[in-house]
Amino acid sequence: MRVTIFLWWLAATMSTAQTMELRRVHDSLYYLNDWRLPYPVYQFQTGDVDGDGREDAMVGVVKSTRYDPVKGRRLFIFKASGQGKARPLWLGTRLGGRLHDFRYRNGRIRSLETTDDGRWVVADYRWAGFGMAFERFVVKGTDRKTAKEYFNQ
């Protein structure tokens, strides 16, 4: 009986494997599975951000927020929730500095940012239950060219 239940559960789990797909309608309207993103998208990555063994979607959007009225690059993270649906895991206003780009790398988000004084940094962030937590600077207080070299490693 236990083997039968396990095999049924395993088959059900495998048949409902979720993938995240970004579809562009035009420059400022995208859909992540069923989730409407009425903003320009500058980056799309997938990977297991929260460590639960399932693929998450990281979408870079350009928009203002309630807490930061200046249009800027933001990071949104989504989880597949069944039947092809996407649900937001984190809709970030800001990481550390002004976000220019990000990459998913070894279970972490690597960011390319500028500070308030115009210097460039590359930083790693990890999932912290709700949102991203700073882990370390890869390089900080540098110029754009050097930061991009570190970011692209």
Which residue stretches match the model-derived regions?
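Short, low-complexity, intrinsically disordered N-terminal peptides in bacterial proteins
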Residues: 1-3, 153
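Sec-dependent N-terminal signal peptides
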Residues: 3-14
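Beta-propeller-forming repeat regions
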Residues: 15-153
